[in-house]
Design a protein with these regions (language model features):
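Non-globular, low-confidence helical/coil segments that flank catalytic cores
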Residues: 4-324
């Protein structure tokens, strides 16, 4: 299996954002990358976790077991989301390289010993930088990574950690479903095999718990959003994790209208170099009267669902755009 090699350029969009001011060390990934990026083989525990069908997921979702908690961990200009349903846990991204220990400690504080699912949305450092710490420190059922590689040290560290764990990464397939306790997860993207921008390789996941739903978008931009809509996926969700830290390159008018969220969450850092969240995005949310919860103003955001209603550990933030 040949994987296209891309160069990591931070989290910035090719057309909208500044290049990162931090020069990242490069590492040539050996052929062992292909061995861990395998969509057909998984560890025994992963196979046990994924033996449920869509019908079984719907049946389970009708008899909820406890609450659902979503932790948008404050990792600055980066993403890391811990999702808990009953005794089951999933982690989406793990922040920058310097956030690894922070995320590990946060998970331990929440009583996490095993992670049923880990998703590295795409190879940018601000999403997978701390992922090697997670892989090294926790027992993991299944790891999802998109079918793309990078020459960066951050990506190389993740590949090495997976290999050293004796695991293989699974390539996500749009339309695939799996259960996290009583919650049902559906993969919506990526829908193409080749993009100019690494952001559009982002794994997009919709989670349903009772009558509540959540959409996690990574750094997916308008190209990926339009592909998701063209595929006819149901993107309606109560809560939307705004793509790409609130960049103008994500959250198109059409996509936002289809999702029609009651709440929005943005993971970003005050005074970041990119001016996130951009004014265009904040104006869209303000015009639709969608409350915005943002880590740069509120710190870690914890969302709780009982399957019928959603509550937050804090009040909403402002619609103020970032300053470049």
């Amino acid at each position: 299996m040949l994987l296209s090699v891309f160069l990591l350029n931070g989290c910035a969009s090719n057309i909208a954002d500044k290049a990162s001011s931090v020069t990242k060390e490069k590492l040539q990934i050996s052929n062992s990358t292909e061995k861990v990026m395998n969509s057909d083989e998984n560890t025994k525990v992963a196979e046990e976790n994924t033996k449920t069908t869509q019908d079984e997921g719907e049946k389970t979702n009708s008899a909820l077991n406890g609450n659902l908690k979503v932790h948008f961990i404050n990792v600055g200009q980066a993403d890391s989301i811990l999702i808990q349903q009953g005794s089951k846990f999933m982690l989406i991204d793990a922040g920058n390289n310097g956030d690894g220990k922070l995320v590990v400690n946060y998970l331990l504080e929440q009583g996490v010993k095993n992670l049923d699912y880990v998703i590295g949305t795409h190879p940018h450092e601000d999403h997978i930088g701390g992922l090697d710490y997670i892989i090294n420190d926790f027992r993991i059922g299944k790891i999802y990574l998109p079918k793309v590689t990078s020459t960066t040290k951050s990506f190389g560290d993740v590949v090495a950690a997976i290999k050293n764990k004796g695991m293989k990464a699974t390539v996500p397939i749009p339309g695939e479903t799996f259960n996290l306790g009583s919650a049902k997860c559906t993969i919506l993207a990526p829908n193409s095999s080749k993009y100019k921008d690494l952001n559009n390789y982002s794994v997009v996941v919709k989670l349903e718990f009772g009558s509540n739903s959540f959409l996690f978008t990574g750094d997916a931009e308008d190209i990926s959003e339009s592909e998701i809509l063209a595929k006819g996926f149901d993107v309606k969700a109560d809560l939307l994790k705004i793509g790409h830290h609130g960049s103008r390159s994500s959250t198109s008018d059409e996509f936002l209208a289809k999702v029609n969220p009651k709440y929005a969450v943005i993971s970003t850092e005050i005074g970041n170099d990119y001016g996130h969240p951009h004014k265009e995005t904040m104006d869209k949310l303000k015009n639709k009267n969608i409350p915005v919860y943002r880590t740069d103003e509120l710190g870690t955001i914890i969302v709780t669902s009982n399957g019928k209603t959603i509550s937050f550990n804090t009040k909403p933030g402002s619609y103020t755009a970032g300053r470049p």
